[in-house]
């Protein structure tokens, strides 16, 4: 039993496209006070049969939905190649590689993402490895479902560590080509 409001946001699908459901692994990376969470996912709740209370059912990814007109969904969303947040995080990555402080770029992203809760999420420079980890996570949160994650994992040499299904390949980097 899903509300009409949610049903109207999800359907119609149209033009041969389906719905993308975000994995729990990715959804768990977002904190509830990060505005990117609600811009990335629509959580779907149904009523619990026994209690009548809302119960989490699933989610859909909101990015690239296009628009709905006259009962049809038109997938007309532009594919984003680069945006300002990408430039900031690439700058942070380059600064960190040069042993410079990437805090200002990361914090500029976080100010927008956390708004009035920003003070609880201020980034301060750590070791080069800690900074890399923070930049990689920030890129996940900022660019989820925009086609950048795989290349970030390759560039940071983190694919085997962060993609559980790659454990089958025992670190064989030749398997990372595609």
What do these predicted regions represent?
Residues 1-26:
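Polar, glycine-rich mid-to-C-terminal structural blocks
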Residues 31-178:
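Acidic/polar-rich alpha-helix caps and helix-coil junctions
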């Amino acid at each position: 039993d899903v509300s009409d409001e949610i049903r109207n946001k999800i359907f119609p699908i149209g033009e041969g496209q389906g719905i993308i459901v975000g994995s729990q692994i990715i959804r768990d990376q977002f904190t509830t006070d990060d505005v990117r969470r609600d811009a990335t996912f629509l959580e779907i709740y149904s009523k619990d049969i026994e209690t009548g209370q809302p119960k989490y059912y699933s989610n859909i990814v909101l990015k690239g939905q296009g628009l709905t007109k006259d009962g049809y969904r038109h997938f007309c969303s532009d594919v984003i190649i680069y945006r300002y947040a990408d430039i900031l995080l690439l700058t942070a990555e380059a600064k960190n590689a040069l042993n410079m402080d990437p805090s200002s770029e990361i914090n500029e992203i976080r100010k927008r993402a956390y708004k009035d809760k920003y003070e609880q999420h201020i980034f301060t420079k750590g070791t080069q490895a800690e900074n890399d980890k923070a930049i990689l996570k920030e890129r996940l949160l900022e660019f989820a479902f925009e086609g950048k994650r795989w290349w970030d994992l390759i560039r940071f040499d983190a694919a085997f560590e962060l993609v559980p299904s790659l454990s089958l390949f025992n670190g064989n980097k030749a398997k990372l080509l595609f």
